């Protein structure tokens, strides 16, 4: 779980799911995050800024994809393992690559905020934001509760345990409908998955 700094003088902050351990073309390693979850200072806390401590900083961003790259503090180990809810089938899965997925593919997402939920990719389309079109999967979650707001950044696994997409946001009127950044588009950012790493 990642959390932002406190907003203003109050005690408000945003928590999101920690993402995937990735490596860029230069061999630098980062953990992905949903970029919109962090203030301009880029400081990342775990579990939150009230009870926790700073564990890293957003050092690179791909704003058109809502993906940020977090460099964790030295000595912190990060492993690409998934949250283990009893209902899910992804417990203990370590994904090896980003997958190319198609309409009709079953996906599963499991995180501390909504537990396990599964659904189907119903389309590959574009979302218009800030006069730019972004490719997304449209997903309908059919098992489990709705995808909660703080699920942003959660990996969506396909039936082979590979990363089909990174969850981005749910429809405000129907939270069972979600949108996710396609795995192949994450690869086009020059990123590949890594099993584990000590920063």
Task: List the model feature ranges, each with a label.
Residues 58, 109, 144-145, 174:
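Short, flexible coil/linker segments at or flanking structured domains
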